[in-house]
Amino acid sequence: MERIKELRNLMSQSRTREILTKTTVDHMAIIKKYTSGRQEKNPSLRMKWMMAMKYPITADKRITEMVPERNEQGQTLWSKMSDAGSDRVMVSPLAVTWWNRNGPVTNTVHYPKVYKTYFDKVERLKHGTFGPVHFRNQVKIRRRVDINPGHADLSAKEAQDVIMEVVFPNEVGARILTSESQLTITKEKKEELQDCKISPLMVAYMLERELVRKTRFLPVAGGTSSMYIEVLHLTQGTCWEQMYTPGGEVRNDDVDQSLIIAARNIVRRAAVSADPLASLLEMCHSTQIGGTRMVDILRQNPTEEQAVDICKAAMGLRISSSFSFGGFTFKRTSGSSIKREEEVLTGNLQTLKIRVHEGYEEFTMVGKRATAILRKATRRLVQLIVSGRDEQSIAEAIIVAMVFSQEDCMIKAVRGDLNFVNRANQRLNPMHQLLRHFQKDAKVLFQNWGIEHIDSVMGMVGVLPDMTPSTEMSMRGIRVSKMGVDEYSSTERVVVSIDRFLRVRDQRGNVLLSPEEVSETQGTERLTITYSSSMMWEINGPESVLVNTYQWIIRNWETVKIQWSQNPTMLYNKMEFEPFQSLVPKAIRGQYSGFVRTLFQQMRDVLGTFDTTQIIKLLPFAAAPPKQSRMQFSSLTVNVRGSGMRILVRGNSPVFNYNKTTKRLTILGKDAGTLIEDPDESTSGVESAVLRGFLILGKEDRRYGPALSINELSNLAKGEKANVLIGQGDVVLVMKRKRDSSILTDSQTATKRIRMAIN
C-alpha cells in the first residue's frame, strides 16, 4: 500500500511524467534485450502500446483504393504518412471494421471445408451441456492426451505426402501414397478444394490438424478423450471442476474406444483356443473397425492399453517399455534387480514358486482411478505413496503394491487354497493367484501388515487397515497423498517378443504383459466392429453362432460340396464348426455326430440320394468326435434362446427353414442367404450333370487331381482332362473337347456315359 501511495505521489509531479515520456532509452543492454531476435519480449505490453496508437496496423498500398479515407462517422481509416522503413500504409483498426461490414464478399463455400476442425468444434460446444461447478481438491496427474479432436491417424510422413499432393500437386518431389487411407483422403480433399482461394499455406496447416494426432503431456483429473481435452480449461481448475457432456462424437475417440473393446474381445477369445498366438493374429487380420482393417488401425494408433499392446506385439510392432500388473502400469524410475526362483509357503502351507526380484527399485504405478510411487527392496515394501479418487481406488492400488512387493507377511496372510484359473481353465501363475486372492478379500492382508507411528508431512496422511485416514498412525510404509503421480511421459517404444500363450517380454526377458492383465470390463463399441473370424461368432451369443455357421456353409458351398464327397474328415475338422459344438448338448454330441456321418456315407454310396439342404442342415453336427451307436434321430437339439430347440432331420423347423420356391434359408426367422441347389436335384436325374463341351471318359481317376466344381471347369484348356463333381455328389473324369462343333451331341452321349461311369 505504501509503495502505491509513493508511486501516486511521484506521478503527480510533472517532472516525473516528463522523464518517463520524453527521456530516450539509450542503455545498450536494454535496447539489445528488446530488439534482438524476432521473438516479441513483452507481447501484452506491445499489444497495449500498439492499440493506443492511432494507426497500429500496416497494409499494402492497394488498401487506399479499396477502403475510403474516412468512414460514415468521418473517422480517418488510414494515414497519408507511409510507414517508416517500408512502402506500406499505416492503418487504423477502424478500417478493419469497415472492411468487415462493407468489403467485397468472396465465395465462402470452401471455408467450412478448410476450417472443418473449427466448425466441428463450434457444433460440439453448441450441443454440449455444461453442468454445475463443484469446488473440491483436484487430483490431477499429467497424462499424454490427444489434443486434436476429429483427426485421422496418419503418421507425420504420410500426412506430409497427402498435404503436398492436395495443396501443391505440381511441386517437384517424390510422393508415395500407399495406404488405403492416404488415397481416400487425397481423392476426397482434391474434390472438396477445387478452385479454393484460401492461401495454400493455411490450407496445409488446417489439413495437418485433420490428419495427424497431436498429443501433449497435460495435467488431467477427468476424461482423457480428445473431446474432453478441448474444453479442459472450462472443466477443471486447481480447486474446482465443471461437469461437461460433449455434444456429438469425433471419429478418433470412437476409434480409440472401439479398438480397445475389439482388442480385449480378441485377446480373451484367443487365450482359450488351442494356439492363442495364431488365433489372435487370424482374428486381428480378419476384423474391421468402422470399415477400416484392424491391423491398419493398430499400425497407426498410439493407444496404450493392455489388450491393444498384446495385439501390437503379436504383429511385431514396438510398444511402450512399461509393464502391467493388476491393471496398473508400472514404470521403473530407478534401481535394478535380478530375478531368482524361490519357493515360499502360504498361510495355508501351500508351496508357491515365485520369481523374486532381488535389489532396490523405484516405480511409478498409474491406474485408471489411482496412482502411486512405490519404493521396494528384495521382498520388502519400503514406501508406497498413493493417491486416488476414492477409498476403493486407493485400496486397489495398495493391494497391488503389497502383492508386487512379494513380502512374507503378504504370503502368510493367504487363507485357504489358491486355485484360480484363467478362461482356458489353466491355473494362473503364483503372482496372479495371490493378486486374485487378495482382490477378493484383503482384510487379513491389511490386518497382518503392521502399523507404525507417523510424522506429519504436508499433504500426506496415514491410512489404517480399515482404510480410514489418520494423522497419527498408518500401515507400515504406506501414505496417502493429495498429489497424483504423473503418467510416464516418454513416447519411446521398444522391440518386444511374444510367446504362444500371448506373454509379451522385453529384450531382457521381463514379462511386460499377459492375458491375465486384460480387463474384464465389457463396453459397447461406438463404431461397428465386424469380426469375420469364426472364433468371434459366439461374442453375440448362441443365435449368432447358429446363423454364422450356416451362412459360412452357404457362402463356401462350392468348396464344401467337393470336400464333402472327397475328403469329409478334413471338412469335419474345419475350425468354422468349432463354435457350433457349444450349442449341442454335451451328453449327446458324439451320438449325433456318428448318426450324421453314417447318413452322409449312405448319400455318397447310393446314387440319387444327394440332398443339398439336408447336407447343409446336418453338417455342423458331424464335426464333433463321433460315437458309434445304432441310434437313429428324427430331430437334433440345439441350445439357443435359453432352451433346447429342435432341428428336424427331414423337413423344416423354426430353427432351420428352407423355402424351396424362393430358395431362401432362414435361421430362427433371420435370413441366412440364398441356397443354389444343384439343377434338377429334386428329380435326381443324371441329366443334371450334362456337361456341354466336355467328353465324359469314365470313372474318377485320382491321377488328375482333386475334383473340380462345374464352375471351375471353364478354366481347362482344350484337350485337358480333369475329375469333376456332378450333381449327385459323384465324381467322373472328363476331357474338354478340342472342337466346338460337337457340343450338340454331348447331351445325348453324356447321359449314357455317366450311367456307365457310375455303375
UniProtKB/Swiss-Prot annotation:
Identification of the protein by name: Polymerase basic protein 2
Which GO cellular component terms are attached?
Answer: host cell mitochondrion; host cell nucleus; virion component
A GO BP term here is: symbiont-mediated suppression of host gene expression
Which family does the UniProt entry place this protein in? Belongs to the influenza viruses PB2 family.
Q: Where in the cell is it found?
A: Virion; Host nucleus; Host mitochondrion
What task does this protein carry out?
Answer: Plays an essential role in transcription initiation and cap-stealing mechanism, in which cellular capped pre-mRNAs are used to generate primers for viral transcription. Recognizes and binds the 7-methylguanosine-containing cap of the target pre-RNA which is subsequently cleaved after 10-13 nucleotides by the viral protein PA. Plays a role in the initiation of the viral genome replication and modulates the activity of the ribonucleoprotein (RNP) complex.
- List the residue(s) that the UniProt entry marks as the site Mammalian adaptation: K627
Q: Which organism is it from?
A: Influenza A virus (strain A/Memphis/4/1980 H3N2)
Gene3D superfamilies xref list: Polymerase Basic Protein 2, C-terminal domain
Q: Which HAMAP family match?
A: INV_PB2 (MF_04062)
Q: Which GO MF terms does the UniProt record name?
A: RNA binding; RNA-directed RNA polymerase activity
Key words of the record: Cap snatching, Eukaryotic host gene expression shutoff by virus, Eukaryotic host transcription shutoff by virus, Host gene expression shutoff by virus, Host mitochondrion, Host nucleus, Host-virus interaction, Inhibition of host innate immune response by virus, Inhibition of host MAVS by virus, Inhibition of host RLR pathway by virus, Inhibition of host RNA polymerase II by virus, mRNA capping, mRNA processing, Viral immunoevasion, Viral transcription, Virion
Q: Motif Nuclear localization signal: which residue numbers?
A: 736-739
Tell me the subunit arrangement: Influenza RNA polymerase is composed of three subunits: PB1, PB2 and PA. Interacts (via N-terminus) with PB1 (via C-terminus). Interacts with nucleoprotein NP (via N-terminus). Interacts (via N-terminus) with host MAVS (via N-terminus); this interaction inhibits host innate immune response.
Under Pfam families, the record lists:
Flu_PB2_1st (PF20947), Flu_PB2_2nd (PF20948), Flu_PB2_3rd (PF20949), Flu_PB2_4th (PF20950), Flu_PB2_5th (PF00604), Flu_PB2_6th (PF20951), Flu_PB2_7th (PF20952)
Taxonomy, superkingdom: Viruses
